[in-house]
Amino acid sequence: MLILTRKIGESLLIGDNVEITVLSVRGNQVKLGVNAPKEVSVHREEIYQRIKALADDVASDTQQ
């Protein structure tokens, strides 16, 4: 795992077209801005896990 330190207003790039910017830090909460093309899905981890679980359920239902 790559670990980076960024200050408010600083960014990091993922590939050529995804930019993550630190917008604010308050206590133990960090607010991030994500600038990515529409074809790139961006989700919080817990939402992604729900989407994946629903897709897995649908896939298993169609195989039965």
Swiss-Prot record:
One Gene Ontology MF term: mRNA 5'-UTR binding
Subcellular location: Cytoplasm
Assembly, per entry: Homodimer; the beta-strands of each monomer intercalate to form a hydrophobic core, while the alpha-helices form wings that extend away from the core.
Gene3D superfamilies according to UniProt: Translational regulator CsrA
Signal sequence bounds: none
Keywords tagged on the record: Activator, Cytoplasm, Repressor, RNA-binding, Translation regulation
GO biological process: mRNA catabolic process; negative regulation of translational initiation; positive regulation of translational initiation; regulation of carbohydrate metabolic process
InterPro entries: CsrA, CsrA_sf
Main localization of the protein described in the UniProt heading: cytoplasm
Record-linked PANTHER family: CARBON STORAGE REGULATOR
Record's function text: A key translational regulator that binds mRNA to regulate translation initiation and/or mRNA stability. Mediates global changes in gene expression, shifting from rapid growth to stress survival by linking envelope stress, the stringent response and the catabolite repression systems. Usually binds in the 5'-UTR; binding at or near the Shine-Dalgarno sequence prevents ribosome-binding, repressing translation, binding elsewhere in the 5'-UTR can activate translation and/or stabilize the mRNA. Its function is antagonized by small RNA(s).
One Pfam short name: CsrA
Assigned GO CC terms: cytosol
NCBIfam families named among the record's database cross-references: csrA, PRK01712.1
Family: Belongs to the CsrA/RsmA family.
Designated name of the protein: Translational regulator CsrA
